[in-house]
């Protein structure tokens, strides 16, 4: 497939990590990354000027999440991803699974709700619009697991095993739209599972773990399908430039291995985050119970002991 419409030199030298990490910004994603960090920093500054704090860990997570997008979209990895299936798969896995998790751990919605000013009575400002969106029927639908899990799976099988992938890769606009789609799908999939930001759905911890593991095996199956294929699956990568010195089928096998192996990394990250949240939730519950006991003299325990004493008296 001709990629000259992307404005890239098709005679790329053989891929190395050093060459792949050279700066080569996509204007759309470069501007988006700069804006994201700028707006986040502005919101944090508003809180601090007001005398409120914001956890440094959340700042680190969000910034690293944005930088992970820049890493795969504003370097030569983006150029090599147009002609090498394996490099494209790295982009896909990072921008759809790793970046969303890091961004969500930064709690951008919570930050926005705290930083945006409350509009006057009877008025609608940005904060009120955001709250309305969060509680809208549309948001309830697109964050429900009945929608997010099939969408997460379809972004693999419905894209790579149909002509849609070749169509999107045929233009710069299509390629950008595909990458934005990957990021959006990752965000709506992991948002209710992570449970860091407020949203329409907040299932229990066990249910969130089940939702996480419901989608992950399909990544492994997809990777295995690529590795076991005896012919190139997508037309875009059937004839890589001779200057790369690679075989299309071998490169596809590497892409499958990346998809298979990478699915484990986000699962572990999210599982650690969920266990930590669960532990902190139990701690808060225990502290509330202790405070209640201190206030009422632990009447609940006294009532239970009295009940046991009455049972013992009846038995005598």
Residue ranges and their predicted role:
Residues 1-316:
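Alpha-helical membrane segments of multi-pass proteins
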């Amino acid at each position: 497939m001709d990629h000259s419409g992307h404005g890239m030199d098709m005679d790329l030298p053989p891929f190395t990590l050093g060459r792949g990490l050279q700066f080569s910004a996509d204007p759309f994603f470069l501007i988006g990354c700069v804006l994201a960090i700028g707006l986040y920093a502005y919101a944090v500054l508003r809180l601090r000027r007001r005398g409120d704090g914001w956890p440094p860990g959340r700042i680190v997570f969000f910034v690293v999440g944005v930088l992970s997008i820049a890493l795969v979209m504003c370097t030569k990895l983006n150029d090599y991803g147009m002609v090498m299936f394996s490099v494209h798969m790295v982009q896909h896995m990072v921008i759809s699974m790793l970046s969303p998790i890091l961004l969500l751990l930064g709690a951008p919605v919570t930050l926005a709700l705290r930083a945006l000013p409350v509009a006057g009575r009877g008025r609608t400002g940005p904060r009120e619009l955001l709250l309305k969106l969060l509680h809208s029927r549309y948001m309830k639908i697109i964050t429900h697991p009945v929608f997010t899990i099939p969408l997460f799976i379809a972004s693999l099988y419905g894209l790579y095993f149909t002509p849609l992938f070749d169509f999107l890769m045929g233009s710069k606009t299509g390629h950008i739209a595909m990458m934005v789609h990957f990021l959006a799908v990752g965000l709506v999939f992991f948002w209710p599972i992570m449970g860091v930001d407020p949203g329409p759905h907040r299932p229990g911890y066990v249910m969130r773990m089940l939702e996480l593991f419901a989608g992950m095996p399909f990544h492994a199956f997809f990777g295995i399908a690529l590795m076991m294929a005896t012919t190139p699956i997508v037309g875009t990568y059937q004839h890589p430039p001779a200057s790369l010195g690679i075989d299309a089928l071998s490169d596809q096998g590497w892409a499958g291995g990346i998809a298979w192996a990478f699915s484990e990394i986000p699962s572990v990250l999210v599982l650690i985050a969920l266990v930590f949240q669960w532990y902190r939730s139990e701690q808060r519950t225990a502290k509330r119970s202790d405070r209640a006991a201190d206030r009422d003299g632990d009447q609940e325990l006294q009532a239970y002991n009295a009940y046991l004493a009455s049972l013992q008296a009846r038995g005598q």
